[in-house]
Amino acid sequence: QSLKEPINTVKVNILGTVLALESCRKHNVKRFIHASTIYVNSADGGFYRSGKKAAEDYVEEYKKIYGVNYTILRFGSLYGPRSDDTNGVKMIVKNAILTGNVNYYGSKKSIRAYIHISDAAKACVDILKNKYKNKNIILTGNKKIKVPIFLKRLSAMLKISKKIEFQNKKYTGHYTVNPFNYKSRKGKKFRLKSSVNFYDGLLQLINEVKKEKL
């Protein structure tokens, strides 16, 4: 969406962040929790990455200039219940259920460390501890999943026999294996004590999508 709406991306990701920071400064908020993305260390991600990267700069500058404490959360590939139709995993699942086709916009070599929303939610509570104050935290799943294997399992779960289609367009804004291919902006990886098995979470999402009014 940000590839098509660069101006709106600036309004939401940059201006929206600055307005929130300014409000925190005026009202002496103890800490600003900022939702960012692992794409800030990537050459991929398009305007979305650019907006998030600029927003992080403002968060850090507000600390330097005004003393507004922060924690930056760099989320990886989220999935799970109550995700909207822009979520990558949900789009794949919903399309498969509606059309009987399993499609992926990206490379066959793609790998993701998917993180279930419940694991991410628990982590968001844990990072309120003082040791995470003024830190950049990376929130991804514990296990790396090869996308072709995930898609094969999805096909089996939905009893789809058609061949999986990879539509590797010239530029989709997404990384293939490693997003960290840009000038490093240091972040500490958050270690999940326990996590939802990806395929258990996938089945949960499939059942939820089937219940929706498609």
Walk through the language-model features, giving the residues of each.
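N-terminal Rossmann-like NAD(P)+-binding domain of SDR-like oxidoreductases, especially those catalyzing
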Residues: 1-76, 208
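Amphipathic terminal alpha-helices
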Residues: 196-214
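Non-catalytic, hydrophobic alpha-helical segments
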Residues: 120, 124, 139, 150, ...
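Glycine/proline-rich active-site loop of Rossmann-fold NAD(P)-dependent oxidoreductases
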Residues: 53, 78-91, 98-101, 105, ...
